[in-house]
Amino acid sequence: MLSRMRPLQKWTQAAIFILTAVSITTATTSTRQLNLVDLVGQSQLILHGTVKSVTDGIDSRGIPYTEVTIRVAEALRGDINGEYTFRQFGLLKPRAMGNGTVNLMVTPAGWATYTKGEETILFLYKRAAWTGLQTTVGLGQGKFKVQMAGAMNQMSNAGLFQNVAIDSSLLGSREQRALLTQKGAVNVNAFVSLVRQAVQGKWIEAGRMRHAQ
């Protein structure tokens, strides 16, 4: 407990919380609207699957986290089979610490949230070197809930296809229709097909999918 920690331990934990809080605040306040080029271009992993479990805890360094396990149906980017587990910053809800204090460091507003059993598509950054935490690209923008044959991120897909230029010769009719979506759910099969082709064909690297402006 904090009341029994040595001064050095207290300072170490305080430093961890300060550094983590600063990085979280910076990420939250600086998030801009991202489109498909950004999501694909900045992701290390792109996973389509079902949320198996969502738990939370506090690691040995005192960093609060939410742990998510995905049953992976398809890894659109990355060599992942079966299940994938990652942790992002923040608790699911405030937690009593048993020493008269309450840890209020919950998942920040605008970050991806998860529900057991939901089908989802995730665009994930690489794990942070220091904390091991991992978040979706653009926070809530990089997590899509699949429902009723549609896929939609936590920003209702606003700006997802804005300023996206793709060589027309690469697109089938359903992908072309998907690109017309300005807001709201996009057909999940068309969206997954589009992302799969972009990754496998290295469209961004070849300049065949790019920012229009």
Ranges and model annotations:
Residues 2, 8, 13-213:
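Transition segments tied to proteolytic processing and entry into folded domains
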